[in-house]
Amino acid sequence: MDRMEEPPDVVIRRLPLYARSLRYLLQEGVESVSSQELGDRINVTAAQIRKDLSYFGEFGKQGIGYNVRKLLQQIEDILGLTREWPVAVVGIGHLGEAIARYEGFRQQGIRIAGLFDSNPSKIGTVIDGMTVQSIEEADRIIREQGIRLAIIAVPARSAQEVTDRLVMAGVRAILSYAPTVLQVPDGVWVRYIDPVAILHSMTYYLARDINSARHNSPES
């Protein structure tokens, strides 16, 4: 049997959106949904949904649509959500602490399994029943807990050093809030969340509209 084509990263990023919408549909008591109805909920075309799902096999029936519960189970299986994933959080400042306390993780198969910081004032504090450990303990705990996912919320100047330590300990996927690009070996995946960069991409549209309004003003 021929191996399925590797799906583009953008497709993988959309799958959690499909899963979230399907969960809402289940809560609403909806049993079947068309690709058009599902697409309307997340601003994706029906054709795009069908194409995305085609990377992983055949789903639904033409003219009938998708069984909501079954499709959700299939997508969760694709995303590896049929098991629990332990996660390490490094950097327990205001942001890191908020991440550690986020209840949504527990509802979606993500378990915070380790909290780490280098600041002596943070080490030993307890967050939701879990003690913040020294970053020096990260290697041991990550290996003992079998942690493969990590979230880092540290300053840019220390982000690469932290990343190197995590990768050496066995972490293979990192969500970074540090405003810098990280260097990682093949087989390690990094996602970035940089609020400033995101806001700057939005100010482009605001500035464009303001400049357009000035240009079209009768006084200009």
UniProtKB/Swiss-Prot annotation:
Domain of life assignment: Bacteria
Chain sites annotated for binding NAD(+): 91-96
Record's keyword annotation contains Oxidoreductase: no
Localization per Swiss-Prot or TrEMBL: Cytoplasm
One Pfam family this sequence matches: CoA_binding
Major localisation: cytoplasm
Chain residues forming the annotated DNA-binding region: 17-56
Keywords: Cytoplasm, DNA-binding, NAD, Repressor, Transcription, Transcription regulation
A GO molecular-function descriptor: DNA binding
KW Membrane (keyword) present: no
Cellular component, GO annotation: cytoplasm
Function per UniProt: Modulates transcription in response to changes in cellular NADH/NAD(+) redox state.
Assembly mode: Homodimer.
Protein known as: Redox-sensing transcriptional repressor Rex
Organism of this sequence: Roseiflexus sp. (strain RS-1)
UniProt lineage: Bacteria, Bacillati, Chloroflexota, Chloroflexia, Chloroflexales
Gene behind this protein: rex
